[in-house]
Amino acid sequence: MLSDARHTIGTSVLAAADGADILVTGVNTEDYALAVSQARGTPIVLGHLTPWLLTDEFPQPLTPQVVPADQSAEQYNLGTHQVAEDVYWQGKRDDINEFRGSLGLPPAPSAALTWTVELGLPTLQAFSEEVVPRPHDWGPRNVMTGFWRLQSEVRRRVGEAEIPEWLAGWLAIGPPPVFLGFGSMPVLDPPKLLDLIVRAAERTGLRLLVGAGWSDLSGLTGELPDTVRLIGAIDHDWLFPRCRAVVHHGGAGTTAAGLTAGLPTWIYTVFSDQPFWGDRVARLGAGGYSNFLEFDLDHLTGVLGQLVGEDVRRRAAAIGERLRAEDGVSAAVRLIGEIAGRH
Protein backbone atom coordinates (compact mmCIF):
# COMPACT_ATOMS: atom_id res chain seq x y z
CA MET A 1 0.00 0.00 0.00
CA LEU A 2 2.86 2.37 0.82
CA SER A 3 4.42 1.69 -2.58
CA ASP A 4 1.08 2.50 -4.23
CA ALA A 5 0.95 5.79 -2.33
CA ARG A 6 4.43 6.69 -3.52
CA HIS A 7 3.47 5.90 -7.09
CA THR A 8 0.51 8.26 -6.65
CA ILE A 9 2.83 10.97 -5.34
CA GLY A 10 5.07 10.66 -8.39
CA THR A 11 2.12 10.77 -10.76
CA SER A 12 0.68 13.81 -8.96
CA VAL A 13 3.99 15.68 -9.05
CA LEU A 14 4.34 14.91 -12.75
CA ALA A 15 0.86 16.26 -13.47
CA ALA A 16 1.31 19.35 -11.29
CA ALA A 17 4.54 20.21 -13.11
CA ASP A 18 2.87 20.44 -16.52
CA GLY A 19 3.49 23.91 -17.92
CA ALA A 20 5.37 25.09 -14.82
CA ASP A 21 8.13 27.69 -15.15
CA ILE A 22 9.70 26.56 -11.89
CA LEU A 23 9.08 23.77 -9.36
CA VAL A 24 8.83 24.55 -5.65
CA THR A 25 8.73 21.41 -3.53
CA GLY A 26 8.55 20.42 0.10
CA VAL A 27 10.56 17.62 1.65
CA ASN A 28 7.91 14.92 1.16
CA THR A 29 7.91 15.30 -2.63
CA GLU A 30 11.39 16.57 -3.41
CA ASP A 31 12.80 13.25 -4.67
CA TYR A 32 10.01 13.07 -7.24
CA ALA A 33 10.15 16.77 -8.07
CA LEU A 34 13.91 16.58 -8.60
CA ALA A 35 13.38 13.73 -11.08
CA VAL A 36 10.78 15.76 -12.99
CA SER A 37 13.09 18.79 -12.95
CA GLN A 38 15.96 16.78 -14.40
CA ALA A 39 13.78 15.06 -17.01
CA ARG A 40 12.12 18.26 -18.24
CA GLY A 41 14.83 20.82 -17.59
CA THR A 42 12.56 22.83 -15.30
CA PRO A 43 14.36 24.78 -12.54
CA ILE A 44 13.62 23.65 -9.01
CA VAL A 45 13.65 25.24 -5.56
CA LEU A 46 13.31 23.31 -2.32
CA GLY A 47 11.23 24.68 0.53
CA HIS A 48 11.78 23.31 4.04
CA LEU A 49 9.44 24.17 6.91
CA THR A 50 11.81 22.42 9.33
CA PRO A 51 15.63 22.34 9.15
CA TRP A 52 16.28 18.93 7.61
CA LEU A 53 19.71 19.59 6.09
CA LEU A 54 22.85 18.10 7.60
CA THR A 55 24.51 20.15 10.33
CA ASP A 56 26.61 19.53 13.41
CA GLU A 57 24.83 22.27 15.37
CA PHE A 58 21.62 20.42 16.30
CA PRO A 59 20.15 16.92 15.98
CA GLN A 60 18.00 15.84 13.04
CA PRO A 61 14.50 17.08 13.96
CA LEU A 62 12.94 13.59 14.00
CA THR A 63 15.47 12.26 16.51
CA PRO A 64 15.92 12.80 20.28
CA GLN A 65 17.08 16.35 20.95
CA VAL A 66 19.17 15.54 24.04
CA VAL A 67 22.83 14.73 23.40
CA PRO A 68 23.97 11.52 25.19
CA ALA A 69 26.59 12.02 27.88
CA ASP A 70 29.10 9.77 26.12
CA GLN A 71 29.11 11.72 22.84
CA SER A 72 30.13 15.21 21.79
CA ALA A 73 27.34 17.40 20.47
CA GLU A 74 28.93 17.58 17.02
CA GLN A 75 29.36 13.81 16.81
CA TYR A 76 25.81 13.10 17.95
CA ASN A 77 24.20 15.77 15.78
CA LEU A 78 25.92 14.65 12.58
CA GLY A 79 25.17 11.03 13.39
CA THR A 80 21.44 11.64 13.80
CA HIS A 81 21.23 13.37 10.43
CA GLN A 82 23.15 10.61 8.69
CA VAL A 83 21.21 7.75 10.30
CA ALA A 84 17.83 9.39 9.63
CA GLU A 85 18.65 9.92 5.97
CA ASP A 86 19.99 6.39 5.57
CA VAL A 87 16.77 4.96 7.00
CA TYR A 88 14.67 7.24 4.79
CA TRP A 89 16.62 6.36 1.65
CA GLN A 90 16.57 2.63 2.30
CA GLY A 91 12.79 2.78 2.48
CA LYS A 92 12.25 4.96 -0.60
CA ARG A 93 15.15 4.18 -2.91
CA ASP A 94 13.48 1.48 -5.02
CA ASP A 95 10.29 3.50 -5.56
CA ILE A 96 12.19 6.68 -6.39
CA ASN A 97 14.51 4.97 -8.84
CA GLU A 98 11.60 3.16 -10.47
CA PHE A 99 9.95 6.55 -11.00
CA ARG A 100 13.19 7.99 -12.34
CA GLY A 101 13.49 5.07 -14.73
CA SER A 102 10.00 5.77 -16.07
CA LEU A 103 11.27 9.24 -17.02
CA GLY A 104 14.39 7.87 -18.72
CA LEU A 105 16.70 8.93 -15.88
CA PRO A 106 19.50 6.95 -14.21
CA PRO A 107 19.14 5.91 -10.55
CA ALA A 108 19.72 8.58 -7.93
CA PRO A 109 22.93 8.14 -5.91
CA SER A 110 21.25 9.27 -2.69
CA ALA A 111 18.15 10.95 -1.33
CA ALA A 112 17.38 14.39 -2.73
CA LEU A 113 18.11 15.92 0.66
CA THR A 114 21.82 15.16 0.19
CA TRP A 115 22.01 15.15 -3.58
CA THR A 116 20.51 18.62 -3.99
CA VAL A 117 23.26 20.03 -1.76
CA GLU A 118 25.88 18.37 -3.96
CA LEU A 119 24.11 19.75 -7.04
CA GLY A 120 24.10 23.25 -5.54
CA LEU A 121 20.33 23.62 -5.78
CA PRO A 122 18.73 26.47 -3.79
CA THR A 123 16.80 25.67 -0.64
CA LEU A 124 14.46 28.11 1.08
CA GLN A 125 14.41 27.54 4.83
CA ALA A 126 10.95 28.71 5.90
CA PHE A 127 11.80 29.67 9.45
CA SER A 128 13.50 32.51 11.26
CA GLU A 129 17.10 32.87 12.36
CA GLU A 130 15.64 34.32 15.56
CA VAL A 131 14.35 30.83 16.38
CA VAL A 132 16.87 28.62 14.55
CA PRO A 133 20.22 30.46 14.29
CA ARG A 134 21.85 29.82 10.95
CA PRO A 135 24.17 26.79 11.16
CA HIS A 136 27.80 27.59 10.37
CA ASP A 137 28.04 24.60 8.01
CA TRP A 138 25.16 25.55 5.70
CA GLY A 139 26.19 26.93 2.32
CA PRO A 140 25.00 30.22 0.77
CA ARG A 141 22.33 28.48 -1.32
CA ASN A 142 20.41 27.70 1.87
CA VAL A 143 18.43 30.90 2.37
CA MET A 144 16.60 31.45 5.65
CA THR A 145 13.60 33.54 4.67
CA GLY A 146 11.71 33.77 7.93
CA PHE A 147 8.48 31.91 8.68
CA TRP A 148 5.89 31.62 5.92
CA ARG A 149 2.60 33.00 7.21
CA LEU A 150 -0.63 32.35 5.34
CA GLN A 151 -2.20 35.46 3.87
CA SER A 152 -5.80 36.30 4.76
CA GLU A 153 -7.06 35.37 1.29
CA VAL A 154 -5.60 31.88 1.64
CA ARG A 155 -7.17 31.62 5.10
CA ARG A 156 -10.55 32.39 3.58
CA ARG A 157 -10.13 29.67 0.97
CA VAL A 158 -9.42 27.01 3.59
CA GLY A 159 -12.22 28.17 5.88
CA GLU A 160 -10.10 29.66 8.66
CA ALA A 161 -10.84 33.37 8.19
CA GLU A 162 -14.41 33.41 9.49
CA ILE A 163 -14.49 34.64 13.10
CA PRO A 164 -17.58 33.45 15.01
CA GLU A 165 -19.53 36.27 16.62
CA TRP A 166 -19.75 34.37 19.90
CA LEU A 167 -15.95 34.10 20.04
CA ALA A 168 -15.39 37.81 19.49
CA GLY A 169 -17.95 38.49 22.20
CA TRP A 170 -16.43 36.00 24.65
CA LEU A 171 -12.96 37.45 24.13
CA ALA A 172 -14.28 40.96 24.75
CA ILE A 173 -15.92 40.29 28.13
CA GLY A 174 -12.93 38.97 30.03
CA PRO A 175 -9.14 38.78 30.26
CA PRO A 176 -7.20 37.17 27.39
CA PRO A 177 -7.41 33.36 27.53
CA VAL A 178 -4.74 30.74 27.21
CA PHE A 179 -5.15 28.81 23.96
CA LEU A 180 -4.88 25.01 24.12
CA GLY A 181 -4.65 23.43 20.67
CA PHE A 182 -4.13 19.86 19.57
CA GLY A 183 -3.79 20.37 15.82
CA SER A 184 -3.37 17.10 13.94
CA MET A 185 -3.01 15.09 17.17
CA PRO A 186 -6.30 13.19 17.65
CA VAL A 187 -7.56 12.98 21.22
CA LEU A 188 -8.56 9.44 22.22
CA ASP A 189 -10.95 10.39 25.04
CA PRO A 190 -12.45 13.87 24.39
CA PRO A 191 -14.80 13.97 27.43
CA LYS A 192 -11.95 13.06 29.79
CA LEU A 193 -9.68 15.66 28.21
CA LEU A 194 -12.31 18.36 28.45
CA ASP A 195 -13.03 17.53 32.08
CA LEU A 196 -9.33 17.90 32.82
CA ILE A 197 -9.22 21.29 31.09
CA VAL A 198 -12.29 22.52 32.98
CA ARG A 199 -10.67 21.54 36.27
CA ALA A 200 -7.45 23.28 35.23
CA ALA A 201 -9.44 26.46 34.58
CA GLU A 202 -11.05 26.19 38.01
CA ARG A 203 -7.72 25.57 39.73
CA THR A 204 -5.82 28.40 38.01
CA GLY A 205 -8.58 30.98 37.57
CA LEU A 206 -7.61 31.35 33.90
CA ARG A 207 -9.88 31.40 30.89
CA LEU A 208 -9.03 28.58 28.46
CA LEU A 209 -9.86 28.43 24.76
CA VAL A 210 -9.58 24.92 23.32
CA GLY A 211 -8.81 24.40 19.64
CA ALA A 212 -10.13 20.96 18.74
CA GLY A 213 -7.94 20.49 15.67
CA TRP A 214 -8.61 17.08 14.14
CA SER A 215 -10.35 15.80 17.28
CA ASP A 216 -14.13 15.54 17.46
CA LEU A 217 -15.19 17.58 20.48
CA SER A 218 -18.63 18.38 19.10
CA GLY A 219 -21.57 17.96 21.42
CA LEU A 220 -19.58 18.84 24.53
CA THR A 221 -20.05 22.62 24.60
CA GLY A 222 -23.25 22.48 26.67
CA GLU A 223 -21.32 21.17 29.67
CA LEU A 224 -18.77 23.99 29.78
CA PRO A 225 -18.41 26.80 32.34
CA ASP A 226 -18.04 30.39 31.16
CA THR A 227 -14.26 30.16 31.55
CA VAL A 228 -13.82 27.44 28.89
CA ARG A 229 -14.77 27.51 25.21
CA LEU A 230 -14.19 25.26 22.19
CA ILE A 231 -13.39 26.32 18.62
CA GLY A 232 -12.65 24.59 15.34
CA ALA A 233 -10.29 25.75 12.61
CA ILE A 234 -9.49 29.45 12.93
CA ASP A 235 -6.92 32.01 11.83
CA HIS A 236 -4.14 31.84 14.41
CA ASP A 237 -2.74 35.16 13.21
CA TRP A 238 -6.04 36.78 14.26
CA LEU A 239 -6.61 34.78 17.42
CA PHE A 240 -3.21 34.55 19.09
CA PRO A 241 -2.66 38.30 19.59
CA ARG A 242 -5.89 38.17 21.63
CA CYS A 243 -4.55 35.38 23.87
CA ARG A 244 -2.28 35.35 26.90
CA ALA A 245 -0.27 32.20 26.14
CA VAL A 246 -0.47 29.03 24.02
CA VAL A 247 -0.23 25.32 24.75
CA HIS A 248 -0.14 23.08 21.69
CA HIS A 249 1.27 20.01 19.92
CA GLY A 250 4.33 21.68 18.40
CA GLY A 251 3.68 21.73 14.69
CA ALA A 252 5.99 24.11 12.83
CA GLY A 253 3.16 26.42 11.77
CA THR A 254 1.48 26.67 15.16
CA THR A 255 4.82 27.21 16.86
CA ALA A 256 5.63 30.02 14.44
CA ALA A 257 2.23 31.64 14.95
CA GLY A 258 2.49 31.58 18.73
CA LEU A 259 6.02 32.97 18.82
CA THR A 260 5.20 35.62 16.22
CA ALA A 261 2.31 36.76 18.40
CA GLY A 262 4.80 37.11 21.26
CA LEU A 263 3.12 34.47 23.41
CA PRO A 264 4.65 32.25 26.08
CA THR A 265 4.48 28.74 24.65
CA TRP A 266 4.35 25.20 25.98
CA ILE A 267 4.52 22.23 23.62
CA TYR A 268 3.21 18.77 24.48
CA THR A 269 5.01 16.58 21.98
CA VAL A 270 3.88 13.30 20.45
CA PHE A 271 6.21 12.58 17.52
CA SER A 272 7.81 13.93 14.34
CA ASP A 273 9.55 17.32 14.58
CA GLN A 274 7.53 18.44 17.62
CA PRO A 275 10.37 17.89 20.16
CA PHE A 276 12.67 19.92 17.92
CA TRP A 277 10.34 22.93 18.05
CA GLY A 278 9.79 22.41 21.76
CA ASP A 279 13.55 22.52 22.27
CA ARG A 280 13.74 25.74 20.25
CA VAL A 281 11.07 27.35 22.45
CA ALA A 282 12.90 26.27 25.60
CA ARG A 283 16.23 27.62 24.33
CA LEU A 284 14.58 30.97 23.64
CA GLY A 285 13.31 31.15 27.20
CA ALA A 286 9.79 31.61 25.83
CA GLY A 287 8.36 28.50 27.49
CA GLY A 288 9.18 24.82 27.32
CA TYR A 289 8.05 21.37 26.29
CA SER A 290 7.30 17.89 27.57
CA ASN A 291 5.99 14.60 26.26
CA PHE A 292 2.22 14.38 25.87
CA LEU A 293 2.33 11.36 28.19
CA GLU A 294 2.92 13.85 31.03
CA PHE A 295 -0.32 15.70 30.25
CA ASP A 296 -2.47 15.50 33.37
CA LEU A 297 -4.17 17.97 35.69
CA ASP A 298 -1.18 18.63 37.92
CA HIS A 299 1.24 18.99 35.02
CA LEU A 300 -1.07 21.25 33.01
CA THR A 301 -1.79 23.56 35.94
CA GLY A 302 1.94 23.79 36.62
CA VAL A 303 2.58 24.66 32.98
CA LEU A 304 -0.14 27.32 33.00
CA GLY A 305 1.40 28.86 36.10
CA GLN A 306 4.76 29.10 34.35
CA LEU A 307 3.32 30.62 31.19
CA VAL A 308 1.64 33.54 32.95
CA GLY A 309 4.85 34.55 34.74
CA GLU A 310 6.25 38.00 34.02
CA ASP A 311 9.74 36.90 32.95
CA VAL A 312 8.59 34.44 30.29
CA ARG A 313 5.97 36.93 29.10
CA ARG A 314 8.61 39.60 28.62
CA ARG A 315 10.99 37.28 26.74
CA ALA A 316 8.23 35.97 24.48
CA ALA A 317 7.02 39.50 23.71
CA ALA A 318 10.52 40.57 22.64
CA ILE A 319 10.84 37.55 20.34
CA GLY A 320 7.45 38.26 18.80
CA GLU A 321 8.40 41.85 18.05
CA ARG A 322 11.46 40.70 16.10
CA LEU A 323 9.55 38.00 14.22
CA ARG A 324 6.80 40.41 13.17
CA ALA A 325 9.44 42.56 11.49
CA GLU A 326 10.19 39.68 9.09
CA ASP A 327 8.24 38.80 5.94
CA GLY A 328 9.17 35.27 4.98
CA VAL A 329 6.60 34.92 2.21
CA SER A 330 7.75 38.06 0.38
CA ALA A 331 11.39 36.99 0.72
CA ALA A 332 10.59 33.56 -0.70
CA VAL A 333 8.53 34.96 -3.58
CA ARG A 334 11.33 37.35 -4.50
CA LEU A 335 13.95 34.59 -4.50
CA ILE A 336 11.77 32.20 -6.50
CA GLY A 337 11.19 34.93 -9.07
CA GLU A 338 14.91 35.64 -9.34
CA ILE A 339 15.71 31.96 -9.87
CA ALA A 340 12.96 31.53 -12.46
CA GLY A 341 14.20 34.63 -14.28
CA ARG A 342 17.66 33.14 -14.71
CA HIS A 343 16.34 30.18 -16.71
Model-derived regions: residue spans:
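Nucleotide-activated sugar donor-binding and catalytic core shared by glycosyltransferases
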Residues: 77-78, 82-90, 94-99, 103-107, ...
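C-terminal substrate/ligand-recognition segments
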Residues: 180-210, 215, 232, 236, ...
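Residues in the short beta-alpha loop(s) of Rossmann-like NAD(P)-binding domains
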Residues: 50, 214, 271
